[in-house]
């Protein structure tokens, strides 16, 4: 008296494949949007940092700005290392230019 049998022979394989393809496309689009969002966030943060450096460089008009800004106003590449302000070591010339 078991009337709750399930017959697997009537499943249409084309419908099953179509559903799998739709799910795969949706998941792929979500992953692509997440990756592009992360990349855009990185570039937005980089631009904010660059704008802050430009503002600080324009605000500080003095010869001792070398630790904070590059001489050539080249802010496209970040500087590595730790900047030491010139007032801490006044007798040491740390500039990247030619010697006097």
From Swiss-Prot:
It comes from Influenza B virus (strain B/Lee/1940). Residues 41-100 are intravirion. Putative viral proton channel. May play a role in virus entry. Dimer. GO terms for molecular function: channel activity. Pfam families: NB. GO terms for cellular component: host cell membrane; membrane; virion membrane. Belongs to the influenza viruses type B glycoprotein NB family. The keyword Aminoacyl-tRNA synthetase does not apply. Disulfide bonds: none annotated. Glycans are attached at residues 3, 7. The gene is NB. It is a single-pass type III membrane protein. Keywords: Glycoprotein, Hydrogen ion transport, Ion channel, Ion transport, Membrane, Signal-anchor, Transmembrane, Transmembrane helix, Transport, Viral ion channel, Virion. The chain crosses the membrane at residues 19-40. Residues 1-18 are virion surface. GO terms for biological process: proton transmembrane transport. It is found in: Virion membrane. This is Glycoprotein NB. The keyword S-adenosyl-L-methionine does not apply.
């Amino acid at each position: 008296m078991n009337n709750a049998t399930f017959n697997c022979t009537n499943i249409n394989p084309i419908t099953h494949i179509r559903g799998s393809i739709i799910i795969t496309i949706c998941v792929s689009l979500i992953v692509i949007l997440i990756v592009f969002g992360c990349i855009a966030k990185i570039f937005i943060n980089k631009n904010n940092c660059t704008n802050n450096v430009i503002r600080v460089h324009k605000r500080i008009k003095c010869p001792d700005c070398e630790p904070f800004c590059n001489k050539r106003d080249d802010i496209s590449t970040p500087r590595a290392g730790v900047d030491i302000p010139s007032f801490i070591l006044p007798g040491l010339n740390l500039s990247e230019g030619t010697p006097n």
